Amino acid sequence: MTINGCKVSFYYTAHTNKVTVEVKNNYKSESQEIDSKNFFNTFQAIKFRTLLNVTCLKEILTDDGVINLKGVNLSDTDLKGAYLSDANLSDADLSDANLSDANLSGANLAHANLTMAYLSEADLSNANLSGADLTNANLNQTDLPNVNLSGANLAHANLTMAYLSEADLSNANLSNADLKRADLSNANLSGADLTNANLNQTDLPNVNLSGANLAHANLTMAYLSEADLSNANLSNADLKRADLSDANLSDANLTNVDLKRADLSNAILKGANLLHINVEGTNMTGTKPWAHTEK
């Protein structure tokens, strides 16, 4: 890169996490190390200054080097591969935006509008998406460990093969969402709406689904070992070949559930409604106790 007749070069050193900026002309050379995060944030802020027609960089870059895009309109914007780690995007409009491969780790996206957004393979680890609207969003193979999605709207979202370990999805709307082969180990889904959701072959060990609504959900071959499903509504759900070993299903509604060839060994079914369930070939070893089976 040439600026005012000087050749400017940038070198990233992984083990120091620094960027060296070197400026050369015909007579001398100067170099300086910069923290890589501040470097990338500054460059990203310059890009957004042009995109948003902002005159002063300080309007979108804080003194601490954090990108502040709170409440901005970035709908239908191509942000593929953008570096937005720890950025403030709360209340922003990102509907239909392309955020694939973007780094949004630690970002604040609380109450943001992400309807129809494309977030495939983005990094959203430790991000705050509480109350965000992700209706019909594409989160295929997205990294979302420890993310806060409490109260978020993920209806009809594509979360196939997404990584949501230890995520907070309490009271989230996941109705009709596709979570096939996603990893939700140790996640909190208490009170979540998962009606008609696809959880085929999904990893849900130790997950908290207490009080969740899973009516008509597809849980075939799902791994729910040691999951808490107390007071959950599983009516008309498909649990064929699911692993529910050591799961807590106390007071759950299992009316018309298909448990063919499922593993319920050592599961707790105290007070559960088991009316019209299919237990053909089901492993009930150590299950305790049965109740509410009246016809």
Curated annotation (Swiss-Prot):
Gene3D superfamilies per UniProt: E3 ubiquitin-protein ligase SopA, Secreted effector protein pipB2
Ranges where the Pentapeptide repeat domain occurs: 67-106, 107-146, 162-201, 207-246, 247-286
Keywords associated with the record: Plasmid, Repeat
Keyword Repeat: yes
Pfam families to which the protein is assigned, alphabetical: Pentapeptide
Protein name per its UniProtKB record: Uncharacterized protein in mobD 3'region
